[in-house]
C-alpha cells in the first residue's frame, strides 16, 4: 500500500472537516463529557472536546466514520488540545497523553476499516496552538514576561506527540498557528518523538492570520513565517481557520509560488455571520474550493470551522482526477526573518545600500559598546532598547546582541533583552544575530525568537564533535549560522589557512548534516592592520582573497566580518576608522562579502573621501606599498589635532553643539503629538507633552478622556483595518500606561476623597471557553486607562460572575468568548444578572460576537445596558461614557434606538428569505 509521500505526488488529497461544530450536533450534556470516570471532577467539562476520546468514543468514531464515507483521505484526530497546558483549564493535565493516544487510536481503527490499496486512509495527529503564546507578554508593564516558555511547551507537546505516534498517527498536523515560536517548539517536539519511536512521519504546518493584511497574531507576515520554517524538514504548509475560501485564496496562491513544500488549505465555511453562525453550505462552497483545485495551487484540501461531511463529499468529487500542485524548488538564496522577511540575494535592497550587502548593527554588544554595557548593568533597558531601535532606523538589517561580560549573567540578560525587543515592532521586524562565546547563552536566545536568527558563532576550535553538536542545535532551533575560520590549531591568519578551514567546515555542514548552504556565513577573521608589525599589514588583503575564494568555491555560502576590528590601531580617531572601513568594504563587497557587523549610522560614502586620503587609505588596506601605514598614522594625528582645535575654539567662543533637528511631528499641536506618540509607541516626549496638556485642560482626567483616548480610538480603527498588528497595539498600550502614570499624581491631587480609579471592571471568559488572549489584551488596555481590573480568567460560570460582581461592587462587566457556544453562554450570564437585580453595564467582545447578536439575543434579557465592543482599544472609551453620570442616560438611549433598528431590519430580511423546503417547492419545473 502506498504511503502519504507517494500518493501526494499523484493526486489531490482530501482532508476532513470541522470536529467542534460536528460534536455540537450531538447535543451532548455535561454528563456526556464527564462520563462515569470524571463525574466528581471540579469545574465544567462541557466544551473540552478532547476528553470525549475517553468518555464518548462512540461519538468521535462516528464523526471519523462519516468523514471517511464522504471520501476523506486524511482523518484529523480529535486531539487539538491534548497538551497539559491546555488541559490544565479542566484539571485534566494528567490525562493529556491518554486523550492524544485514544484520539489517534480511534481514528486508526476507522481508517483501517476504510483503507484499500487504491485508496489508503491516513491519520493526522492534530496538535493545536494552545491558548498561550511564547512570543508575547501577558503583562503590559513587563514586556519580558512570558506565560509559557519554549521548554515548557516543548515538554507538553512531546508528551502529546508520543501518544499520537503510539496511537497510530501517520502524519503530525500542527495547525491554527498564531505564534511561530510556539510552532517551532512543536516541530522540535514532533521530530524529537519521531526519533524516539524510530519513525519519520510527515509534518504538516498550517497557520492562521489575524487579518486580511496577512500577519499572524504575533505579528509575522506569511513570508517571514515561511522563512522561520525554512530550516525544518516540513512536508506541507498551508492555512486554516480565520477565513473563508475567497479571503484565504490570495495567501494560498502566494504560498504556492514561493514555498518549497506541498500546499494545504482548509478554510472555514465562509466567515461567521453576526449571529456567530456559518452561512456557507456545501453546494455554495464547492465552486470556491474548485478554484483552488483547478488553478493547481493545492495538494491537500479540507475544511475548518462550520464544514461537515457534506462539504468534504463535494470537495472529494471536485478533486477526483485533478492534478495536484507542483512544488516549487527551494530558493537559491538566504531567508532570514523577524516580523518581516529579509531575503539575501542579488536583488536585496536595504535602507543604506542598494546592494547585496547586509548591515549587521554592532551597538547592542556589551563587549563592543561601553554605553550599552553601562545601560545593561544599570538595568536601564528602555535606553538600551533605544540603541537597537536607532540602529534599525539607521539602516541595520540585522541586530547583533551580545551579553558576554564577566560581571553579567549573560544567559539571563540575553533572554530578557530578546524578549523585550520582541515587544518593539520597529526592532522586531528585523532578524537577530545571537552572539556569544557561551553555547548555553546562544541556545537560550534561540528559544526566544520566532523569526529565523543568525547564530554567531560556531567553529572547529574544539574539534569536529563539538562543532557538529553545535551545528545540530542550529538546525534544531531553525537558524542560520556564522562559522569562524578557527580550528584545533588556532585562528586562521593567512589566506591558505582561512580557505582550508572554510572548506572543511562547509563539507561537514552540507554533506554530513544536510544544512542548507545558503544558511552558512563564513567569518574569515577581520584582523587589525597598521599595527606596526609587518606581518599584520596583509591581513585585509588575505581576508578579501579568502572572501573571493569562498564565493567562487563554496556554493551558496555567505561571508561576514566584524569590520571595526580592522581599524583597531586607530581607536580614538573616528574619521580615519570610518574611512578605513569604507575602503575595506568597497573592495570586499566586490568579491562576495555580503554581511558586515558595522555601525550602520557611520557608513561613509566611498566616493566622497578626498582623493589623496583615499589613495593613502587604499595603500594601507590593500598593502600596496611600504611606509603607507606610517603615513596614515601621521594623517590620523593631524586630523585628530584639527578636530580637537575646532572643539576648543567652539567652546571658547561659546558656540553650543548643534542640536539635531526636531522630527516633523513635534511641530503639531499637543493633541496631535500625544496621538502620534500613542500610535507609534514613543515615550521620549510624554512628560513634556503632558505638562503642556495639563496647562491647557482644566483637569488631568480631561487629558485622558481627550487626546489620549482619541489616540487609542485611532489605534483601534487602524487595527480593525489591518493597518496595525497586535505587537504594535500592545506597545501603544504600554505607552498609554506610561502617560497615565504621569497623570496619576495630578488626578489624585484633584480628588476630593473619591475613588482612586476610573472604575472597577470585572473581566471573564465565559463558561465553556478557554480562550483568553483577547481578554488579556482588554485587561491590559483598561488598566492602562486607570481602571481597576478583576480578571476571573477562563471557563467562568455565570453564577461566579454574578456573585463576584455583587461582592466587589463592580462598575461594569466584560464578557469574552471566541467560540460559537460562548454566544449562548453570554445570554445565560445576562439572564442571571437580571435575576440577581444587577443593572450595571455589560461589555461583550470576542471573535464570534457581533452587535446584531447583542441586539437580538442578549440585550432583550437584561434591563441594564449591553454593548458590543469591536476591539480592545475601544473598551476604555465606552466605559468612560457608561460611568459618566451625565453621559450614561444619553448613551443608553442611543443603544436602545440602534438595537431596535437592528432587530427590525433583521426580521424584515428574514421574512424575505424562503426556507429550504419552500425554495424546493418553488423551483422551476423544466420537464
Where are each of the predicted segments found?
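Domain-level signal for soluble alpha/beta catalytic cores
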Residues: 1-927
Amino acid at each position: 500500500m502506498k504511503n502519504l509521500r507517494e500518493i501526494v505526488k499523484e493526486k489531490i488529497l482530501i482532508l476532513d472537516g470541522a470536529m467542534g461544530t460536528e460534536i455540537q450536533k450531538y447535543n451532548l450534556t455535561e454528563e456526556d463529557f464527564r462520563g462515569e470516570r470524571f463525574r466528581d471532577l471540579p469545574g465544567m467539562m462541557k466544551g473540552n472536546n478532547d476528553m470525549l476520546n475517553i468518555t464518548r468514543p462512540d461519538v468521535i468514531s462516528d464523526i471519523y466514520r462519516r468523514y471517511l464515507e464522504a471520501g476523506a483521505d486524511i482523518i484529523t484526530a480529535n486531539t487539538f488540545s491534548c497538551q497539559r497546558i491546555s488541559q490544565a483549564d479542566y484539571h485534566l493535565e494528567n490525562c493529556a497523553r491518554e486523550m492524544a493516544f485514544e484520539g489517534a487510536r480511534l481514528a486508526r481503527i476507522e481508517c483501517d476499516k476504510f483503507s484499500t490499496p487504491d485508496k489508503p486512509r491516513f491519520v493526522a495527529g492534530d496538535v493545536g496552538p494552545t491558548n498561550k503564546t511564547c512570543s508575547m507578554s501577558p503583562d503590559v508593564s513587563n514586556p519580558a514576561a512570558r506565560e509559557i516558555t519554549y521548554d515548557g511547551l516543548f515538554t507538553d507537546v512531546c508528551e502529546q506527540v508520543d501518544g499520537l505516534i503510539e496511537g497510530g498517527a501517520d502524519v503530525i498536523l500542527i495547525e491554527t498557528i498564531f505564534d511561530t515560536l510556539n510552532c517551532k517548539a512543536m516541530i522540535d517536539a514532533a521530530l524529537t518523538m519521531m526519533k524516539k519511536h524510530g519513525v519519520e512521519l510527515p509534518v504538516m504546518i498550517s497557520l492562521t492570520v489575524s487579518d486580511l493584511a496577512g500577519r499572524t497574531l504575533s505579528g509575522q507576515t506569511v513570508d517571514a513565517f515561511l522563512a522561520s520554517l525554512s530550516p525544518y524538514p516540513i512536508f506541507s504548509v498551508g492555512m486554516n481557520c480565520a477565513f473563508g475560501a475567497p479571503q484565504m485564496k490570495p495567501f494560498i496562491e502566494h504560498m504556492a509560488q514561493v514555498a518549497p513544500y506541498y500546499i494545504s488549505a482548509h478554510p472555514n465555511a465562509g466567515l461567521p455571520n453576526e449571529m456567530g453562525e456559518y452561512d456557507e453550505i456545501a453546494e455554495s462552497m464547492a465552486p470556491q474550493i474548485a478554484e483552488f483545485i483547478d488553478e493547481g495551487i493545492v495538494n491537500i484540501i479540507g475544511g475548518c470551522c462550520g464544514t461537515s461531511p457534506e462539504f468534504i463529499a463535494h470537495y472529494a468529487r471536485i478533486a477526483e482526477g485533478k492534478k495536484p500542485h507542483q512544488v516549487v524548488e527551494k530558493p537559491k538564496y538566504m531567508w532570514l526573518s523577524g516580523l518581516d522577511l529579509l531575503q539575501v540575494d542579488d536583488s536585496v535592497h536595504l535602507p543604506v545600500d542598494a546592494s547585496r550587502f547586509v548591515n549587521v548593527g554592532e551597538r547592542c554588544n556589551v563587549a563592543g559598546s561601553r554605553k550599552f554595557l553601562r545601560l545593561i548593568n544599570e538595568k536601564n533597558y528602555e535606553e538600551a532598547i533605544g540603541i537597537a531601535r536607532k540602529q534599525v532606523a539607521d539602516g541595520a538589517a540585522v541586530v547583533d546582541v551580545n551579553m558576554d561580560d564577566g560581571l553579567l549573567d549573560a544567559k539571563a540578560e540575553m533572554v530578557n533583552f530578546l524578549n523585550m525587543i520582541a515587544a518593539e515592532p520597529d526592532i522586531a521586524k528585523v532578524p537577530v544575530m545571537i552572539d556569544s562565546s557561551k553555547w548555553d547563552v546562544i541556545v537560550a536566545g534561540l528559544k526566544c525568537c520566532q523569526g529565523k536568527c543568525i547564530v554567531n558563532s560556531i567553529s572547529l576550535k574544539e574539534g569536529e564533535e563539538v562543532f557538529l553538536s553545535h551545528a545540530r542545535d542550529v538546525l534544531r532551533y531553525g537558524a542560520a549560522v556564522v562559522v569562524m575560520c578557527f580550528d584545533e590549531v588556532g585562528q586562521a591568519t593567512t589566506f591558505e589557512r582561512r580557505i582550508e578551514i572554510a572548506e572543511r567546515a562547509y563539507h561537514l555542514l552540507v554533506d554530513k548534516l544536510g544544512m542548507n548552504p545558503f544558511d552558512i556565513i563564513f567569518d574569515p577573521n577581520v584582523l587589525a592592520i597598521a599595527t606596526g608589525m609587518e606581518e599584520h599589514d596583509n591581513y585585509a588583503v588575505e581576508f578579501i582573497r579568502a572572501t573571493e575564494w569562498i564565493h567562487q568555491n563554496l556554493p551558496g555560502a555567505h561571508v561576514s566580518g566584524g569590520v571595526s576590528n580592522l581599524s583597531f590601531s586607530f581607536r580614538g580617531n573616528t574619521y580615519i576608522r570610518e574611512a578605513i572601513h569604507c575602503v575595506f568594504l568597497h573592495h570586499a563587497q566586490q568579491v562576495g562579502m555580503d554581511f558586515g557587523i558595522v555601525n550602520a549610522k557611520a557608513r561613509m560614502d566611498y566616493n566622497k573621501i578626498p582623493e589623496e586620503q583615499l589613495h593613502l587609505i587604499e595603500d594601507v588596506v590593500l598593502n600596496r606599498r611600504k611606509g603607507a601605514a606610517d603615513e596614515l598614522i601621521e594623517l590620523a594625528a593631524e586630523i585628530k589635532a584639527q578636530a580637537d582645535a575646532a572643539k576648543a575654539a567652539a567652546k571658547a567662543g561659546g558656540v553650543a553643539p548643534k542640536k539635531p533637528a526636531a522630527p516633523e511631528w513635534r511641530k503639531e499641536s499637543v493633541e496631535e503629538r500625544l496621538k502620534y506618540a500613542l500610535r507609534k509607541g514613543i515615550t521620549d516626549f510624554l512628560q513634556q507633552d503632558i505638562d503642556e496638556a495639563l496647562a491647557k485642560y482644566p483637569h488631568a482626567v480631561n487629558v485622558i478622556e481627550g487626546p489620549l483616548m482619541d489616540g487609542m480610538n485611532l489605534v483601534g480603527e487602524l487595527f480593525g483595518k489591518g493597518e496595525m498588528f497586535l505587537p504594535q497595539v500592545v506597545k501603544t498600550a504600554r505607552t498609554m500606561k506610561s502617560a497615565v502614570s504621569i497623570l496619576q499624581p495630578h488626578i489624585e491631587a484633584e480628588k476630593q476623597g473619591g475613588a482612586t480609579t476610573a472604575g472597577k471592571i470585572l473581566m471573564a471568559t465565559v463558561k465553556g471557553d478557554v480562550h483568553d488572549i483577547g481578554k488579556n489584551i482588554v485587561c491590559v488596555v483598561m488598566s492602562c486607562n486607570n481602571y481597576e481590573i478583576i480578571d476571573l480568567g477562563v471557563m467562568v460560570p455565570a453564577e461566579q460572575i454574578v456573585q463576584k460582581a455583587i461582592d466587589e461592587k463592580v462598575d461594569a462587566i466584560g464578557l469574552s468568548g471566541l467560540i460559537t457556544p460562548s454566544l449562548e453562554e453570554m445570554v445565560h450570564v445576562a439572564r442571571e444578572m437580571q435575576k440577581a437585580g444587577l443593572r450595571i453595564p455589560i461589555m461583550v467582545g470576542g471573535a464570534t460576537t457581533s452587535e446584531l447578536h447583542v441586539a437580538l439575543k442578549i440585550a432583550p434579557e437584561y434591563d441594564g445596558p449591553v454593548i458590543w465592543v469591536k476591539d480592545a482599544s475601544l473598551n476604555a472609551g465606552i466605559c468612560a461614557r457608561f460611568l459618566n453620570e451625565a453621559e450614561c442616560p444619553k448613551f443608553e438611549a442611543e443603544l436602545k434606538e440602534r438595537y431596535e433598528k437592528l432587530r427590525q431590519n433583521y426580521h424584515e430580511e428574514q421574512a424575505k428569505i424562503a426556507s429550504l423546503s419552500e425554495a424546493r417547492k418553488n423551483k422551476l419545473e423544466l420537464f
